Amino acid sequence: MSEHSLLGAGLGAIIGAILALTGAGGGILAVPLLVFGLGLSMVEAAPIGLLAVGLAASVGAVLGLRQGIVRYRAAGFVAGIGILMAPLGLWLAHRLPNLPLALLFSLVLLYACGRILRKARLELKQGQPAPRPAFMPCVLNPAQGRLRWTLPCARALTFTGMLSGLLSGLLGVGGGFVIIPALSRYTNLDSKSIVATSLAVIALVSLGSVVTASLSGIMHWAVGAPFALGAVLGLVLGRQVASHLAGPRLQQLFAITGILAALLLAGGALGLIAP
């Protein structure tokens, strides 16, 4: 294995470990790592990041399915919408210069990390997770243990799928920072089920986007394969220590790291920071 491939595998392992420790939203750092670590452009990094995040999320989703905590109908619905929207994001990405893509990614990363930071701060202050909305359009039927499918529920999940799919194709993000808050806001699922269902959506949408990128001839497998394998290995190893390290303090550290990465990415794109 070449030095470049080893570096890619090492960076992938970092992403896998972050996913294991911080949850489904941790994969958003994959693209900045590829840009900084391997010198790729945004368009080159996006499908590689999705490949790694998709495979790592697949591992988590399979484990969730075995535990019976994945709402597979909701996951399939959201993912189906996302897969349909991802090619539009990919089409837009290839028609935008690197600068606006990098700046847009930086803004999305700042937004996502800002939400994580706020949530962690509230949890530390209150000693428990922040309260959820009183009205939720998607609620479990206690008799069947399944979500009640109503028009408001379908509308909320459709919007979630559209946004996550568009961002997946456009920026190469799995969409956990969209899906997890949406499921927390619109459903009364418990946190474990929300994360597991989100991982299933991320896996399906990400891998669907990777297939689209491969068919378009823009997937660099020589870089993507070691990076993805490293991510899966990092996820498996990270899960061994996740229960001992995970918590609001770790979420704060992740959010601050993400904010710094966003600022560095924007600064590099604007020429304010030397490559």
Predicted regions and their residues:
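Generic transmembrane alpha-helix signature in multi-pass membrane proteins
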Residues: 30-31, 58-69, 167-168, 179-184, ...
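Short helix-coil transition sites and intra-membrane helix breaks within transmembrane domains
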Residues: 18-27, 168-175
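Interfacial segments of multi-pass membrane proteins
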Residues: 30-44, 168-169, 178-193
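N-terminal transmembrane alpha-helices
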Residues: 12-24, 50-53, 57, 79-82
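Conserved glycine-rich helix-kink/hinge and helix-boundary motifs of the Major Facilitator Superfamily
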Residues: 47, 195-196, 255
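Juxtamembrane transmembrane-helix boundary motif
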Residues: 1-17, 36, 42, 63-165, ...
